Regions:
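Active-site-proximal alpha-helix that buttresses catalytic centers in soluble enzyme cores
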Residues: 2-3, 11-77
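Short, active-site-adjacent cap segments at secondary-structure transitions
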Residues: 13, 59-61, 83-85, 154-156
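Phosphate-handling substructures
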Residues: 27, 69-131, 184, 191-194, ...
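Short beta-strand scaffold positions
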Residues: 54-55, 128, 149-150
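Active-site-adjacent alpha-helix immediately C-terminal to a catalytic or transition-state-stabilizing loop
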Residues: 61, 69-71, 132-191
C-alpha cells in the first residue's frame, strides 16, 4: 500500500485577492514562505517520504523545496501536477469574471465539471494528467510514502477520484494553503486518512 501526502502550496498574493491563478507563475508571499517551512517540518517529523513530486510552477516548487530540505530529499517536477489553465479568466477576480463571463462564472460555481475555460482547460483535462502523474509516482515508488505538491484544483480532483466521486463533487473539498491530505492506495482499495490538515500552521499568522 502506497501512502500519498497531497500538499497544496503556500499562500500567494493572488490567493489573498482570490484571483484566478492557474498557470500564472506566482511566488509565495511572506506568509506563504512561512507556511512552506511549517509544512516541511511537519512532514519531516511525522512521515518518512521516499520522494517529493511537484508542479513546475514557482509557488509549488518553493513549497516542495522546503519539504524536501526538511526530509533530506530532492524534488521531482511533474507537469501533470500543474494548475488548471484558466485561459481568458487568468488574473481576474470572481467579481470581474462574473461581469465579463456571467454564464461561465455561474456554471463554474454550480456545475464545474461542465466548464471549458476559453483558451484554457476543463476539469477533465486536469484530472487526466493528474491521474497520470499519480500513476507514474506509484509505479516508481510502490509501497512507499510520497509527497505530491500541487494546486487546489488538482487537490480537489484527486480527492474526488480517490473516493470514487466524479468531478461534479469538486466543490465538496476546500484544501487550504499549505494543507496536507493523506490517502493510501492499493489494488484492493483506497483509504482516505485525513483531509485539509493545517495543525502545523498554528501560530504563524494568517
Amino acid at each position: 500500500m502506497t501512502t500519498i501526502m497531497l500538499v497544496r502550496h503556500g499562500r500567494t498574493a493572488w490567493n489573498r485577492e482570490e484571483r484566478f491563478r492557474g498557470r500564472v507563475d506566482l511566488p509565495l508571499d511572506e506568509l506563504g514562505l512561512k507556511q512552506a517551512e511549517a509544512v516541511g517540518r511537519r512532514v519531516a517529523a511525522a512521515w518518512q517520504p521516499a520522494a517529493v513530486y511537484t508542479s513546475p510552477l514557482r509557488r509549488t516548487q518553493q513549497t516542495a523545496s522546503a519539504i524536501a530540505r526538511a526530509c533530506g530529499l530532492e524534488t521531482t517536477i511533474h507537469t501533470g501536477l500543474l494548475d488548471i489553465d484558466y485561459g481568458a479568466l487568468a488574473g481576474l477576480t470572481p467579481e470581474e469574471a462574473a461581469e465579463q463571463y456571467p454564464a461561465l462564472a455561474r456554471a463554474w460555481r454550480g456545475a464545474p465539471h461542465t466548464v471549458q475555460f476559453p483558451g484554457g482547460e476543463s476539469l477533465v483535462d486536469v484530472l487526466r494528467r493528474a491521474q497520470m502523474a499519480l500513476a507514474e509516482s506509484l509505479t516508481s515508488h510502490p509501497a512507499q510514502t510520497l509527497v505530491l505538491v500541487t494546486h487546489v484544483v488538482v487537490c480537489r480532483l484527486l480527492l474526488c477520484a480517490v473516493l470514487g466521486l466524479d468531478s461534479s463533487h469538486f466543490w465538496h473539498f476546500e484544501p487550504a494553503a499549505a494543507s496536507i491530505s493523506v490517502f493510501q492506495i492499493s489494488p484492493e482499495r483506497n483509504i482516505l486518512l485525513s483531509v485539509n490538515d493545517t495543525c502545523h500552521l498554528a501560530g504563524i499568522g494568517a
